[in-house]
Structure formats: structure tokens, C-alpha cells
Amino acid sequence: MIGGLCKGKDLIVLKIGENVKDEDGYYTAFKHLTEYCLRFTDNVIVAGTYWKAPKKEEAMIRVARENNLKYVPLFWIYELYEEEVKAHVGDTIYNIKGKPYTIKTDFIITHPNNNGMKMIADEIFKIIML
């Protein structure tokens, strides 16, 4: 599966969940993924969802606690700073290589803009540095 991506890493950050539809099976699936990652490193950080999703968030917190892992709550970013962190049609965002992309459709506007992504990264980085 993702073993090639995990092998030799000293840190794995699990940042998933926003697009998962099966909330009832989320705990089991997330637990399985976490246990798989723990086979490669003990240093796994669980990052919560960007959009409030109580059932998924509860599952991630539970798995983090069961495995004595650090957990980063993130939903508050969108809740408190929605207008500053959500993308708008016409905004320019940048991919990981710095290439600009102008948002042309409504699909992407619910996602974090560059400011939102920076806030997410900053919160995760704070936990890494603990």
C-alpha cells in the first residue's frame, strides 16, 4: 500500500478525513491506517479535520489517545477565520512547487487558501516542535 512512502521516515503526519463519507467506519479505518504507519515509525502525529466533523474528529482523538500520539485540532481555523482562510473565485493559490493557479470554479472555494494552508501548517509545526 503506502509502505514505500512510509519507509525510512522519522515522522508521519496523518492529515486526512475531510472527504470521507463513511463516518460509521471511520474509526476502524483510521485505526488501521495509524497502526500501519506505526510499523515504520513511532513518531506519528494525528492532525484533525479542517471542517468541523465531530464523529471523525472523535475517532481521530480516540486513536491518538490509544496510541499515545500527538493530536492537532484544526477545525477552529475555519470556524474562527472563515473569510480570511477560504479561497474565492479569482484568487491565486500556489502548488508545492510555487506554480500559481487562479481559482476558476466554486468547487475549490471551500478549501483553504494560502493563508489557511499556512495556519494549518503552523499548527502542525507547533506540535512537531514540542
Model features per residue range: what roles?
Residues 1-130:
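Alpha-helical cap/lid subdomain in secreted, periplasmic
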